[in-house]
Amino acid sequence: METTYRREALTVRVIFCTSGDSAETIADVLTGAPTSASFFSVLHDLFYSQILAPRVTLKLCLPARRPGNGTRCSPVLVLRTDASVASGFLGGRPLEASDIKYMLLSDQTAGLFKPLLEIIGGARAPPNQDACTFQSQVAWLRTKFVTALRKLYKMTPSPYWMLSAFGAQEAQFVLTSSFYFFEHTVVCTTETVSHLSRLFSPQQGQTLVSVTSHEELGQLYGTSPFRRRVPAFVAYVKEKLARDSLETEAIDRTIDQIRGKLMLSNQDLVHFIYISFYQCLNKRAFLRYSRQTSSSSALRELGEDPQLCGALHGEFRDHVQSYYHKKTYLSTYIDIRYVGGVLPDGYFGGSLVGERCVYWCGQSKDTASLLATISQQVPHLRLQNEFAGMLDVAALRGSDDGQFKEGLFSHSQALPLYRCEFLGKQFFTMLQEDGLERYWEQSVIFPGDQDWDMLSDKDLTYRIFYHDLSLSLPTLKEQLLVSRHEYFNPRLPVYRWVLDFDLPVCRDIDRTFEEVHSLCCSLREAILDIIQLLGPVDPRTHPVYFFKSACPPDEWRGEDVASTSFCRCHDKLGMRIIVPFPEGVCVVGSEPMVALTGILNRTIKLDPELVHRFPSIQKKGGPFDCGIYGRGRSVRLPHCYKVGLVGELCRLLKILVCHPAPNGKAQYVRRAFTLRELLHHSPGHSAGHVGRIIYSIMDRNENFLENKTISYLPAKIPHIFQRIETLSGRSIEDWLHSAVWDKAYDTICKFFPDEKAQQFSHVAFTQQGENIIQLRPRQGRHFLCINHNHKNKSKTVRVFLTLHSIRVSEVTVTLMSQCFASKCNNNVPTAHFSFVVPVGLAS
């Protein structure tokens, strides 16, 4: 049954077009100039079939060029005509411009353009301004007026932009365009309305691909049966958007409730939010929700309670909350594997004490020569010719494998391997006897004979004095007493957990002893929580030794230092932390130590109080370096100096007493100056006895948020190099030169400084890995830093292209670089720009 519109006065908004230049045609109509153009109705807001009102007011509108959240169309002409004429016009019959002049309501139309004419008129007033009419104003300013219309409104000769924006199916176009132009109480994107139109009307009507003119589009709109459904569609959109808002607010609220109880790093937070939204809005859940909200009646049946956020309850929430809670994390997700047996020896005990230093030392060429000699004499050892072979030599013991050591030392035992910087060179040293403890006895002053247990940690720390040095010593033997680094040896058992702690801190902020000591106490608690997973210890008395890197000298700061200041470090606060494993426990291999330190990094990130006081703990992987347990990695010993660029001694690792137990402070301090208590592989008291040999430590859910996120991302196309070569018929290098590098080099020249861009004028490509192409300059192997102008302008920066594809028709190419400078995040890859290269990857 057709609906009629019974009003004495009816106003209809019409989106129109003309047969000629619309801006010029409007100016002709307003000035009374002769024109043969015709006006066509494209869209209008009269959604009923019959008009019974005798007269109709037509507001002819044009689409706004940049509407933002404002009005999408604005009237430019106001007409009044008979119902029959209006009905024909709205149904697709054109109106001639000559007829429109007689229908024009001049006063109302003039009111529409008054602000515009005032702006474009400016100081150029027409003659006889007092007697000037609206028609004469438009005529006087016609050129500017026409230009302004073109800037304000979208006037195109083709309907293609409308079909692209609102859809090429009849129902989709009619419903979406009508809502977009004539419904201003709800603001949402065209894509959203288009999606809702497909939900609202499964029947889409005829296709519009054959429509080539606004006239044809207007005729289709004027006769479309879907036009009558626009009011119902508007009501549905409002209900649907209200329901969507309810659901999204519930999702946000639930996510905030869950993450408010979690200690998440920035990276983990991004992954958590992505996974949370995926849980609620993945394809299956979204399609199910769309079916449940496809009509007004279905929306009413859904009830008032939100549906989508239910996916965040249950297993996912419990899993996240238990993993990101310190107690449940350590008790649930850490897997430790061990075997029972006699604990192996570490370093030979006699090599850690002595009245003097007895050692072998040499530089890189000497170690290579020694390894070559040993390999000739004892070939079955299969020693590496590189420095890693020295670690094998240091670990060998016994009359069989280690007999060649008797030519170097008086016995064949496992020895520590150190690195010492002297005279600007690196010396590698194995010691059979070590006078380091005796040197400490002579160069460090301890408190008097009073009861040390009566002193606080602060008093003890302040009453231990070092003999400060500032310059390297005359001989290598003396230099070994003040500066050395111990190498981690994967072939020896680990009895002590040596930790390298670097915490980024704010510049120009001094810290009191109490603040640093509180940090140490929190770290001690976290370390002992993990140590107790390996074996039983008394957390009140088990020693954890802290050695803080000395602050820069006062003169470096150029300002007064407050008397209460204990730490004046800027950029980072560095400490060496050492804790013995429980009695009857040792760890073998690098991997368990790396995993154990990674667990510690995660554990301290789960301490809300600690993170609140030191937010930088959450940065990157954590403040504890997991890389010091690899082959060929070394750390500076406590009570030793760092050697500067010109041989100066600085940043002494001084003891910071942190032993909360009321008793045992004297023993704690004395052991902190005992060499066997400070090394990775010095034997424990239980070496040679039956105990636990731990060979695997694993976080069962390590990086589970990241891994889960990756599993939800679109799958990458594998073997990308082979596919490109097969389908293009060219080698990767030829394809890069012809299809990739020109675009990459143009981008480099456009956005990089000239001195940085010119080094890329001639490059070679080297395939590295499955999807990495390394760039080589014409001269040398690497490039200058792209990010910063470092003082050291050496060409050490690695630049490469990564290829990534998730669509069979294109490859995403990213230019990346790695710089070793601390200002560039110490070799962390930096992405500079990406672009897409079309390629036929479909097989």
Curated annotation (Swiss-Prot):
Site (Essential for primase activity): D500, D502
Pfam families, per database record: Herpes_UL52 (PF03121)
GO terms of biological process kind: bidirectional double-stranded viral DNA replication; DNA replication
Zinc fingers classed as CHC2-type: ranges: 785-824
Subcellular localization(s) per the UniProt record: Host nucleus
First-level EC class: transferase
Superkingdom of the source species: Viruses
Record's keyword annotation contains Transport: no
E.C. designation(s): 2.7.7.-
GO terms under cellular component: host cell nucleus
Keywords: ATP-binding, DNA replication, Helicase, Host nucleus, Hydrolase, Metal-binding, Nucleotide-binding, Transferase, Zinc, Zinc-finger
Gene Ontology MF: a single term: helicase activity
Family per similarity comment: Belongs to the herpesviridae DNA primase family.
Described function: Essential component of the helicase/primase complex. Unwinds the DNA at the replication forks and generates single-stranded DNA for both leading and lagging strand synthesis. The primase initiates primer synthesis and thereby produces large amount of short RNA primers on the lagging strand that the polymerase elongates using dNTPs.
Subunit structure: Associates with the helicase and the primase-associated factor to form the helicase-primase factor.
Protein name: DNA primase
Species assigned in the record: Human herpesvirus 8 type P (isolate GK18) (HHV-8)
Source lineage: Viruses, Duplodnaviria, Heunggongvirae, Peploviricota, Herviviricetes
Name of the coding gene: ORF56
